[in-house]
Amino acid sequence: MQVDIGAILTGYAQGYFLMADEETGSLAWYGTEQHALIPLDERFHCPRSLRPLVRGSCFQVRINGAFEQVVEGCAARPQTWISSELKQIYLALHQAGFAHSFETWQGDTLAGGILGIALGAAFIGESMFYRIPNASKVALVKLVEHLRERGFRLFDAQLMNPHLARFGAFLMDGRDYQELLQQCLRIPCRFD
């Protein structure tokens, strides 16, 4: 399959995201009137119960250590929007330096991870998974720390859910989001 990286990046740069229909597998662009953002400032909240795991040595963090395994982990659900075509797109974006995996490990075991796309100072979180309890939560906290250190200004989680709300996620309307995204696209940041 030939992937038009430029066209894919243009879609993300306009605030859209790709999803496959769970039943047919057909791929389409989706937009939302409000984007769920993970704050990269003092509004970010690490739940108290998670703090010992974040400070401890239970999980080690790696970047892009097992990208394909993270994609597979994110897709391994009874119903998934990550089709085989979308997996190929993520792999092409990864090979081009845009898609990344942020992983938690226990020894030699991949415990969990987050899949996302970095464009300028924006990180667009596509999906996350865990195999060991709390691994994806620790990955989220450590990813926020990493994005702060690298100068990122936007962490787009796309759609709100109660899990993200526990970390301080908030909704931003489309117009404000577009303005922030366009600013971030002009700021060079290196993810890895």
From Swiss-Prot:
Subcellular location: Cytoplasm
Biological process per Gene Ontology, one example term: protein catabolic process
Protein name, entry field: Leucyl/phenylalanyl-tRNA--protein transferase
Matching Gene3D superfamilies: Leucyl/phenylalanyl-tRNA-protein transferase, C-terminal domain (3.40.630.70)
Domain of life of the source: Bacteria
Broad class of the protein's primary localization: cytoplasm
Presence of keyword Cytoplasm: yes
MF terms in GO: leucyl-tRNA--protein transferase activity
Cellular-component GO terms for this entry: cytoplasm
EC number: 2.3.2.6
